[in-house]
Amino acid sequence: MDRRASSASHLVSGALGGLVAVVLGAILIATGVIDTGDETVVRQGDTARPVAGGNGRDAATVNEIYRRTDAGVAFIQASGGSTGASPIPGLPQPPEGQGRSTGSGFALDDEGFILTNAHVVEGADEVRVRFGDQDSVKVQVRGADPSTDIALLKVDPGKVKLRPIPLGDSSKVRVGDQAIAIGNPFGLEHTVTTGIVSALQRSIDAPNGFSIENAIQTDASINPGNSGGPLLDGDGRVIGINAQIETGGGSRGSVGIGFAIPINLAKRVIPQLKEKGKVEHAYIGVTTAPVTEGTEGIDLPADKGALVQDVAPESPAAKAGLRAGKTQTDEGLVVGGDLIVKVDGIAIDEPPDVARAIADNKPGDRIAIEYYRGKKLRTVVLTLGERPKRVPQQGGRGQEPDQPDEPKPDKPFQLP
């Protein structure tokens, strides 16, 4: 850089800064903010403005929301076992030594149930929580689901004063809405950060390698130790569970891109965690890719859908005869496989739609899948399986050439 140009720009900046200061000073004197006499007069500023609530109306200030909800946010300490290392980059969980980790959570009800992330308590021999200035108490891990990264803890309500935080409706969240995160980043308890909902319907990786759909993206600062804490709307209701951050390739701290698990997903899994201690997810057993620029020139029969890349051995998809491709393009896309365009009557525009289409199903349910094999549109009915604990290793690629061309449904079924 030309040092003279740089110096000149600094001089201009300084001159402008001095001019602004003079003008601003004149304004402050004229308005009475600055007194030129011996006595200094300080005017009281405007009261804090309320932030816009999740439904667009004026709501409480951030301070009011913090004072109303902070007592319901828990500081979680997990020790023993394999705690202290996140299985996926971006999970904001700091190690605090061998087999020890910390995180956040929040009171769900007066019965003693607490929500947090599964990766915060995974493998722990002992989990303790502390609300505000109360004593730390031991809690039971009632259940955990690595596929959604949600864990449900249970504390004796007689041993701690609980201040449940009301749950919102994540389906009503809109981009630009107020977002407030409360938690314990780097062990700094009672920390509140604010921002907005930056984007919706993000797909993030769960600790077991499966995808979590419809995650909420926010620029409210989320750091290691925030995991499991609440993401609140402008009315102080929980719209998400803070779970992951984009680190920017090396940094352990926030770069303004954080992700929260939608609270509506938590509402769906809580009953199973209470009853069974685990969640049974429906499973097809395919890995798919979108129809994008990388598929140009392949002459696909549709411009939307989920292109099958891999079929897990012994999965419902494999048993039904769905096929993956055999040829890999320069972009790494596997072509020549089936193109899924509809699942259980729901149109498939992109791969995440497949998971969304079966989200409300359970293992054992039977669904119809419409797909193209070459130019021919076909339909197969399969019985959904139970999702394995971790994503199966790829390598099936589907049927071998000498296998039958037609998929084999379990038995005749009335198509939707």
Model-assigned labels for residue ranges:
Residues 3-304, 309-313, 332, 343-346, ...:
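Serine-dependent protease modules
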Residues 326-330:
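Surface-exposed intrinsically disordered loops and tails
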Residues 337:
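Conserved catalytic motifs of ABC-family nucleotide-binding domains
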Residues 375-377:
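Short, exposed coil/turn segments at beta-strand boundaries within extracellular/luminal domains
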